[in-house]
Amino acid sequence: MAPNPRSPTPHSTVPREQWLVARLALLQEEKEFTRLRDALSRRRRELPWEPVEKSYVFDGPDGPESLSDLFAGTRQLVVYHFMFNPADDAGCPHCSFWADHFDGMLPHLRHDFGASFTPAEVQSGKPLYNVGTLPPGVQDREGLSVFFKDADGRIFRTYSCYARGIDMFNGTYQILDLVPKGRDEDPEATQSWVRHHDRYQEPGA
């Protein structure tokens, strides 16, 4: 299970007792990482909120929907910025790779903001993305934003992340990070191996 067939880096082999010592040492680092991640999650939740003043309208399956409509009776909303050129017959394969992980979450989670750009922004050569700017001509990028609606119906953006910041939402990458070969991607073209889930070729095909 890995994106490409390169062999993993050679590793030493040791008896079980020595392996267990090394594993327990790493476990202490993993626990520290978990504590740091929990602290970071608390800080993320404590970020100040930004009021959403603009009236956003989306093309829903049954017609136009406002940002408020997307809450569907809930107080919290997570929006994935999915790249889908209207001229294409399918959405971005990389965004689809992330979206494949969402369906299983939705039953549990149920009990365009700074990632798409107007023609004027693209023409200016400085569309804002990930608290920075993108190369000229780029019209949309992947990302994820979180919103909250208060009792008065006011909507606030509470968090956004982009690029490597969305890694935590991709279960496949979390598994690949556990195996000896890791993600094993071309550093100059990460995700070049990714296809829509029904468009992979069988090995040897």
What is each model feature region?
Residues 1-97, 103-108, 117-205:
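Non-globular targeting/processing and membrane-anchoring segments
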Residues 112-114:
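Loop/turn elements at helix/coil->beta-strand transitions in domains of secreted/extracellular proteins
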